[in-house]
Curated annotation (Swiss-Prot):
Protein role: Tetrapolymerization of the monopyrrole PBG into the hydroxymethylbilane pre-uroporphyrinogen in several discrete steps.
EC number(s) from the headed UniProt entry: 2.5.1.61
Signal sequence annotation: none
GO biological process terms, semicolon-separated: protoporphyrinogen IX biosynthetic process
Enzyme class: transferase
Recorded metabolic or biological pathway in which this protein acts: Porphyrin-containing compound metabolism; protoporphyrin-IX biosynthesis; coproporphyrinogen-III from 5-aminolevulinate: step 2/4
UniProt subunit comment: Monomer.
Protein's recorded name: Porphobilinogen deaminase
Miscellaneous remark of the record: The porphobilinogen subunits are added to the dipyrromethane group.
Keyword annotations of the record: Porphyrin biosynthesis, Transferase
Length: 309
């Protein structure tokens, strides 16, 4: 492979393409003379659209095909939403860079209502996320939760056609696609704890590729890395994939990192919440300690039941 070419494996969805184009533009800005090529492809999670993600099972529904492309040397890097990225990597691949985070909150999207609290009894809310479902049901058990799959445009079209009274999406995706006007309300982390890594973009590459690692290094955002590492460490210890009722959100104030986490029954009947604080350089240890706290208070029972269903 030429020293001045780098090939990005990416999913074909508009949001995934935005992320890949963002990385391409940053690399070309930082390294004049570098040519960046995109290799768009479909993943299992993109193809199977008629089944709830939690029912398809397995981890890495949106990444495996991209990883195969790197292992076969058809691509040099893969760009991912951190919340879709499994905590374990195939041998020879690893997470190299975490870029600066966009807004990590969930967004309430509706054509007729301003917030979850405004929704009438029995209103239909669309989301395929067990994490969002458990928190919505805990706050509003009178609402009807209906599964919602597809890319951002598909989901908005289903809302507009009247299938749902409201839908919940990641705010970052709407902002990146310049669809901010569709956001009726940003849902605070207190109301809906985000998924681990939500709003952050990660770059994976071959662990032995020194050339690519050097090219990627300037894209690293250290504060985002600490936050996401803490969130992912909690998720790893809980053995969570991207389709589990687990929320994790880290914030940094000076050198101090505060991590909030939760595990909940998808029906909202039980939610276990915890918080831990410490030095940001201990991000992984903080995440693991919060996971242990949640497990000691019954999180394992909840997660075992989810995995068995």
């Amino acid at each position: 492979m030429s020293e001045n070419i780098i090939r990005i494996a990416t999913r074909k969805s508009p949001l995934a393409m935005w992320q890949a184009e963002f990385v391409k533009a940053e690399l070309e800005r930082i390294h004049p003379g570098l040519t960046v090529e995109l290799l768009p492809m479909s993943t299992k999670g993109d193809v199977i659209l008629d089944t709830p993600l939690a029912k398809i099972g397995g981890k890495g529904l949106f990444v495996k095909e991209l990883e195969v492309a790197m292992l076969e040397n058809r691509a040099d890097i893969a760009v991912h939403s951190m919340k879709d990225l499994p905590v374990e990597f195939p041998e020879g691949l690893g997470l190299q860079v975490i870029c600066e985070r966009e807004d990590p909150r969930d967004a309430f999207v509706s054509n007729n209502y301003k917030s979850i609290s405004e929704l009438p009894q029995g209103a239909v809310v669309g989301t395929s996320s067990l994490r969002r479902q458990c928190q919505i049901r805990a706050a509003r058990p009178d609402l009807v939760i209906k599964d919602l799959r597809g890319n951002v445009g598909t989901r908005l079209a289903k809302l507009d056609s009247g299938d749902y009274d409201a839908i919940i999406l990641a705010a970052a995706g709407l902002i990146r696609l310049k669809l901010n006007e569709r956001i009726a309300n940003f849902i605070s982390a207190e109301e809906s704890l985000p998924a681990n890594g939500q709003g952050a973009v990660g770059i994976e590459c071959r662990t032995d590729d020194a050339r690519v690692k050097a090219l990627l290094a300037p894209l690293e955002h250290l504060e985002t890395r600490y936050r996401v590492l803490a969130e992912r460490a909690m998720n790893t210890r809980l053995e969570g994939g991207c389709q589990v009722p687990i929320g994790a959100f880290a914030e940094i104030n000076g050198d101090n990192l505060t991590l909030r986490g939760l595990v909940g029954n998808p029906d909202g009947s039980q939610i276990i919440i915890g918080t831990v604080s410490g030095s940001k350089t201990d991000a992984v240890a903080l995440g693991e300690s919060l996971a242990e706290d949640l497990l000691s208070r019954g999180a394992k029972t909840i997660l075992d039941a989810v995995y068995a269903s």
